[in-house]
Amino acid sequence: MKVELTPFRQSRPYTCVVTCLRVVLAALGADYPENDLASACNTDPSGATLSDAANAVRSLGFNALFLPEATFEMLSEWLQHGVPMIVGIAVDDPVHGVTSSHAVVVCGIEHGQVIVVDPAIGAERQLELETFLRAWRRRDNRGLVVLR
């Protein structure tokens, strides 16, 4: 099961949530510039939260479901209905020895791989299921679903 999405690349290191929102909104037929979404999400140099993103899309007239403790089963069910989920994940930087937060759009699960649109590279990438689950769990399994 896979939802076809148009990837966008984030223009700043802290606009991953905003760019994920742009990807999902584009799939719903709405084209918003990154700067407008960043402002609506109250984005600052530390980024934006999925909760802020949910409030922003509601103010734009969309329905949003912020899931503070989503499950893999919930994620799978949304995908089966053709709805991608924005999730927060932990990303390790072994060079600098730090872990940072990042957001990606989960658009599919196939053959033990989770397919995500990663705004850091502006493209799809595949993650091993266990790698994805570990990274997602480290950010409390947060998710955001946007609907018309």
Can you say where each PLM-predicted feature lies in the sequence?
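Short coil/loop residues immediately preceding or within conserved phosphate-binding loops
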Residues: 101
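Helix-adjacent hinge/juxtasegments
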Residues: 55-81
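Sec-exported extracytoplasmic/periplasmic mature domains
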Residues: 25-30, 58-62, 137
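Noncatalytic regulatory segments and standalone regulatory/sensor domains
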Residues: 43-48, 80, 90, 97-98, ...
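Active-site-adjacent structural segments surrounding the nucleophilic cysteine of cysteine proteases
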Residues: 1-47, 71, 86, 91, ...
